[in-house]
Amino acid sequence: MDDPNQCTIKQEDSITRPRPTEAPTIQNLKQEPAIEEGSSSTMDNMLMLTIDTNQANWQGTYDDDEMDLNNKTDLIPLLETEKTTINEDELYDDEEDDDDDEEIKKGIGFELLAQALGMSAKVPVEKEEPEKERAKLSGVGEFMKQIRGEIKPIQKERIVLDELGFRVRDPSKFPPCRIAEVQQTLTLADHQDGIDLPPPNAPTDVRIVRKLIRQKMVRCKKCKNRFIEKNIYERHLRDKHPDLYEEYIREQEEEVELQRLEEIEANRIEELQTGGFIPPENEISQPSEDPNYIPLPGENNGGLVPRFDYYGRIKQLKRPYKKKVSPQCPFCDKRFRNEFSLKKHFAKKHEEMVEFQQCLKCFKCVENDAEMANHDCELTYVCFECTPIRNLCTDNRLLNHRKKFHRGANSGFRCSFCNMKFLTPRKLRKHKKMSHVFTKTFQCHFCEEIFISEVAVMTHERMHTGIIKFECKVCDFRANRYTAMEEHKRDEHGYVCAICHERHAEYPEMKHHVYEEHGGYLAADEPTAYVETPRMWILYKGE
């Protein structure tokens, strides 16, 4: 009986195989007959071999009958060596993906080996997972593995925060702010000048300074730009975003109405806490409101009287006047009525600053664009008590600004005539010019009454001296002024109707009375004292 370990090979008579001219494909290899059942384990291991076509290079034809079995047995050590090599390569099969050409070479080498042994075999095709097949066909798997091999581990950076919660920076790149030094200098200057100003309350960290400035700035909802002046923000909305400007106006009106209601509620709570509110005497003396009273047009809506056009359609009402913040000079802190006045001020007082530019980081004003790139952008001389926050650029300007606007309990400039206080010297001068412009006064020689002109004093003294210049022609009334005599004639005498003896102070009223009540008209169109005509109606003047 044959050895079971020995291969059973089916031989055919004079099998002659020519040299292949083309490399067989996988489809042709699949058509070869499979190995018969009962083959040994050696053949099972042989199925996993991969032999290059160069190792199976043969020429001519051969017959299986003439092949010596010893030659077949000589191939067994070679097969075992290749088996060991293949088993080692299988360890890395999960890490590398073979190309389609390598699969073809695998089938070609196995067929040539089987032909050399005089057998036919079927190339085993390993079934791969669908994901690996797609990755192999598209090349994504190999590419992703290359990427995974090149990714470096993430380096964690340690961030250190200071006591304020900000990130600690390199002091060479971020030098310390000089705000504390400037505040100490201002305090010493205040004591030297003898002015008791309150100590400046300003942060010393430049990051907190920038945060405070951003909080006090107004930001546009649409373009996210920031504005330090509210009037500039309103002009920006009016010119760039008209739809937002209308909404902004409505919000301002609602805010004003809300403040008014809050004030009324606060007054009501105060009345409840204090036990009632006692109105002043002048309000008590006034008559109570009549419930049947019909208000005049525009009386209850702020004086806005509706207007109608020729066709009876109501006209568009004008928006009520609202006080806006006047523009201010960034160099000398003066405010003006409008932008035109501010431009005139620039041309007159700051000729070199007509085309100035303002930095949006430190809010300094420079002459032109060239100096904007080279200016010292720092927040050192900042006044935090102003709204909006102002950067005065120099210590001298900051000191003068605090003396002028932030004097604490001593703030305000007092008028020497009426003891009123004003915020700036300019407002004090304006008050004196408007209220105390009359430097000369004229006093009556008979009493202590004072007049602003000599003519007024002479007219008043006629009452004491008895000099009479005007006498009434109807009664014995006398007056020293013409206006007083005219008032007497109109009030005491006036015009009397000849029919019903009704009295009227003005001639047009008398004329209208005669036409409406008596169905006639006056004989004369001029207010003559005595008129006699053939007409029925006679007009009398006086009693």
UniProtKB/Swiss-Prot annotation:
It comes from Caenorhabditis elegans. The gene is tra-4. GO terms for molecular function: DNA-binding transcription factor activity; histone deacetylase binding; RNA polymerase II cis-regulatory region sequence-specific DNA binding; zinc ion binding. This is Zinc finger protein tra-4. It is found in: Nucleus. A zinc finger (C2H2-type) spans 218-241, 327-350, 381-406, 413-436, 442-464, 470-493, 495-518. Keywords: Metal-binding, Nucleus, Repeat, Transcription, Transcription regulation, Zinc, Zinc-finger. Interacts with histone deacetylase hda-1. May interact with nasp-1. Residues 1-38 are annotated as: Disordered. Probable transcription factor. Promotes normal hermaphrodite (XX) development, in concert with histone deacetylase hda-1 and nasp-1, perhaps as components of a complex. May cooperate with transcription factor tra-1 to repress male-specific genes in hermaphrodites. Synthetic multivulva (synMuv) class B protein, required to repress the induction of vulval development by let-60 Ras signaling.
